[in-house]
């Protein structure tokens, strides 16, 4: 049998979407598709107009005839995957080979009635690359994102050199020999990944840290490279700390600048503007400062104000430069380290240009935003002490800084969070971290945040990928039941005995600690030591 399909768009994006439709029609129903004109079609695939920028999916099906429509390119792809999910397909982890696909008859397709009209709960729904990754790891993950309802991918730095290098040179694995690796290879792989993002219509985030190093003449593509020194001519640009101007811990990416020096802002703005001109494919360009704390300039001029006030002035200067070039690139600015403290004087002149990103990197993951007593437990933000800050673990203190920023900025924003960046290693069953993600995402709108980007290892999937699955599903529809998600995912992954597997995983999680792994709390903990001993013995019981 053949399903006749009309492609309204007839472009690169819709062509890929139809390839996916064809693949899953064949895999689920052993049925091919044929492209025809609209009047002959069984299935109409196309775009609709909708003022809401959030992805909106419309799916109708009755007696083998219907429509798959969306207001966005990536939404159209999400809609196709969503339709097959209604037939029992579960996208359990990155890579086609990990899809759970039931074997159905063509008659099952003809008998199905669908009427789905859904708008994503949040606009920002994505992941930022971390870890050690092969090209295939990254591509599989990008391919997985719309299958679980996500619409964004963030490649840190100019290209993913740092993450590919860790994989191909096996930096942390002495048992494997280095593979062929070069700057030219990285750029080739990076260009290929950009095309994969584009053909799926995924929202493209880029760079982040590295601009401070660029001002000093070091490329952001090399990430956290260290062991370097600064020339005398560049020292006036570098933050003065303890009377000296040197690279912080010998790493450009960790080095802050003297933002009272007007040449610093001019150079940074020019570099960012030139990058934006060359990369119109980047939807959200992240402009962050250094990736270290307690490294802020102590010169007489810088001591007169907060670094966040200096940051806002640079962002306003950047906005003017981009506007003069006719560039509509969105700029993400960061609440992180010293920038957690809100500016005292400056405000953004053009809020529409900017998206605020709240990054509570030292937060606890033993509780959720939804667990906070907002009426009684949010403290007054601590006063800023230059180069003596201690970042908070508590959600209450972290949120106190966010709320101060929200008094000065009412525009678009999202949380940039880290459950799968480090904390997940402390959860042996991956169930406690999954529930924290579930509750966090369900509560974001109460914090006036319009989504979530997960800063994470892409290969965070042991013993399963339920944390990311929950993340994607909840960002798409925040009212979903946690119990429903558990059954949907684990019954596909483990079959009829899934409940006993989940029971074991939940026990593992209950006897382990994300915070302990993240160095939160005492290193000597007799209770936790006993819990780990119990977890160790669970495998034999």
Predicted regions and their residues:
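Structured mid-domain segments that build the active-site/substrate or prosthetic-cofactor binding neighborhood
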Residues: 264, 274, 377-497
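Conserved radical SAM core fold
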Residues: 162, 250-258, 292-294, 359-368, ...
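Catalytic domains of carbohydrate-active enzymes that cleave complex glycans
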Residues: 38, 421-422, 448, 473-541
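Substrate-binding cleft/loops of secretory-pathway carbohydrate-active enzymes
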Residues: 215-222, 333-368, 425-434, 460-470
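Feature activates predominantly on carbohydrate-active enzymes
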Residues: 2, 8, 12-20, 24, ...
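Short, well-ordered secondary-structure micro-motifs within conserved domains or adaptor modules
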Residues: 33-57, 67
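Active-site neighborhood of glycoside hydrolase catalytic domains
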Residues: 263-333, 337-355, 360-365, 375-378, ...
